[in-house]
């Protein structure tokens, strides 16, 4: 079973039969699920219902159970129609709940003076919305109540409930007031801090301005001194000098384009810097590799370069030799090697024949000098014997001219051998 929320309010009670002063009555209502009042809006207002309503001035008790917006009676007239029923229902709930119900879009849509409870007789009481103008009272809406035959109501309990509600309201008001005071003090403190910061900023700006003025004056003074030095040395200044202000305002006066746009300049700077950084990294890497290669040269044995002919980006370390060139080189090497072999073998055969002939002459007791033997046997092989004779003459001359020379021991040994023979 859902919990019922109670609200206590006061309402004027008027007796139409007696011309007495208005009395005050207590009114208590019970609303199911009072938590929804916090989120009540214009759309959900029409669905809100009051479970029970009690009104008493101290002698009689009148009540109405389970009623809603459709139980209101609207008196159409000026500015009042059936569509105004929603506004009237809102004003009734606002009065009965002590302004707990509040919707800004519906507030003060109906012009009225007050709510009253009119006692017509002991059978019917009516809660009426009235508009009073020039002693004329006009009814806008009414809600009929019926008497309670058996039952009683504790007015003191209702008064105590009303008192507690007032206490809660006062406590809430005091808390809100304290919070407001704290917020105001905080705002004042922040305002004072802001004033101090503004003063500090002004002081800083003044010092910065003074420093900049001093630097500019020193710059102008230095420029005057330099001009004076140039004038004393008869150095003519260029006529193309541009003022600093013109240089500074050049980019400002130009329209925004890809040349002076900050975003474009930053993008272009990145594209220029990144390749430089990449090249720098590559150089550092190659330098580290070279240092590592030098440090490890004494420890690690160098291997043959398997990538000697490796081509990088279409280039090679040495000229590329085609298959045809390699075949020609091999043929030249074989030919030269064959010629050398033939000459060496022929010389060895001729020298062996000469030695045999000399041995036979010695056996017969005939002595012949080296030059004579070269002449007798010079025609053994045409040009080859002449070559040997010239070699013998060279050897004998070398022996006579360089007998004490140690730089050619092999030639000296051969010449001595020839002379002894």
Swiss-Prot record:
GO terms for cellular component: chromatin; cytoplasm; DNA ligase IV complex; nucleus. One of its GO terms (molecular function) is chromatin binding. Signal peptide: none annotated. It is found in: Cytoplasm; Nucleus. The keyword Transcription does not apply. Its main location: cytoplasm. Keywords: Cytoplasm, DNA damage, DNA repair, Nucleus. Interacts with DNL4 (via BRCT domain). Interacts (via N-terminus) with NEJ1 (via C-terminus); the interaction is direct. The DNL4-LIF1 complex interacts with POL4. This is Non-homologous end-joining factor LIF1.
